[in-house]
């Protein structure tokens, strides 16, 4: 790992503590939505670990997933993966997107649609494509399904070369 990446990880250590309660896990249903768009990607890296269900879900869907019980900002990232797919902690969405662009790999990250209105994301507009689910997504927390999300989310994609920049499911 080069010094720039080490520096990024050190800068994120204090930020990472802020998302202690921001650990909602993606359901298998949500991951299934992505399958048509990741046919050529078999080794997935999800740097955020909740209860480990995501790794199991990806394996059930025929994909290999690197998702270990380690803090995403306190470690070196694996190099042998095809794509990053993650339901990131929304409280640190800007820092996550910066990190993922730094890793120079394709990614799909789940974030609120409202993030498109944030000033910081405008520098990425030309690089991003969106996959917008047909309904509000529900997440699990501590292994239990939530009551439902009160906001809309979408998948922010980079490096997938989708046929359209915005895909509505």
Language model: regions and residue ranges:
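Class I S-adenosyl-L-methionine-dependent methyltransferase catalytic core
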Residues: 1-169
